[in-house]
Amino acid sequence: MPVDTLSPGAPATPALPFRLRTKVPGYLLPRPADGGARKPSAVERLEADKAKYVKSLRVANTRQEPVQPPLVRQPLFSPGPRGPVLTPSRRVLPCSGRRPQLDLDILSSLINLCDSPVSPSEASRTPGRPEGSAHKVPPATPPRPPPSTVAVRRVDVRPLPASPARPYPSPGTTTTSSPGRPPGLQRSKSDLSERFSRAAADLERFFNFCGLDPEEARGLGVAHLARASSDIVSLAGPSAGPCSSEGGCSRRSSATVEERSLDRVPYGVSVIERNARVIKWLYGLRQARDPPTTEG
């Protein structure tokens, strides 16, 4: 039977059902052998029938382009670590097929070294080196101080703050305080020195305000100036010294805190009283400066 008279037969693979045909991608479906026309898609069919449901002529003449996904632009420089770029001069040469053969003498010496106990002289040798290089002594490094001395130096450089030791008072200078004296009447030396320094600062400030020369003030006498200006600084508070009599101490010890606060003199001087004291003080300075004239 001649070959030309043979007609093309049916495809070898049976036709797929509709259920499987919708799930299988189009490029896997069998194509017709005769190269028939492709079935138009729904978009193409709507585009062909646009004149039926579109009233505007301008819209009917336009063609809708298929929607394409946006292109994701990759950054020029990725934030992650990049491998080193090899220039033509730095390209890695392909390694040769032969690998360097291991020296049997070195291997045997290493095995013997592991089996035998290590001596101090052999411990200084570096494994993997020939015997000639083992005799080289490394340069001596300066000895480092032990960690204990370093810790001691650190303690010496930054000592902990220690409270100052108070000197013990001698038995001859100790004074017996009365047991009935309240703690409010005891004044420390620092409090008294602070009061004296404050009074001296106020006195110097008053001299500068009045325009008095400090040398002239020293020439007039410190005792006279201090006595004349004692009324300007402030009113004297309750006495900080020891009690004059035992009766006064007992009266103070029996008083309460409220009574002591009422007995205190209020701090502050009126403007009129202050001006009067200034005039009195300036008059005293004038009398001290001008010698008394004798009438004769």
Curated annotation (Swiss-Prot):
Its main location: cytoplasm. This is Protein FAM110A. May interact with CSPP1. InterPro entries: FAM110 (IPR025740), FAM110_C (IPR025741), FAM110_N (IPR025739). Residues 139-148, 161-170 have a biased composition (Pro residues). Pfam families: FAM110_C, FAM110_N. One of its GO terms (biological process) is mitotic spindle organization. It is found in: Cytoplasm; Cytoplasm, Cytoskeleton, Microtubule organizing center, Centrosome; Cytoplasm, Cytoskeleton, Spindle pole. GO terms for cellular component: cell cortex; centrosome; cytosol; nucleus; spindle microtubule; spindle pole. PANTHER family: AGAP005440-PA (PTHR14758), PROTEIN FAM110A (PTHR14758:SF4). Belongs to the FAM110 family. It comes from the Eukaryota. Keywords: Cytoplasm, Cytoskeleton. Residues 61-97, 117-192 are annotated as: Disordered.
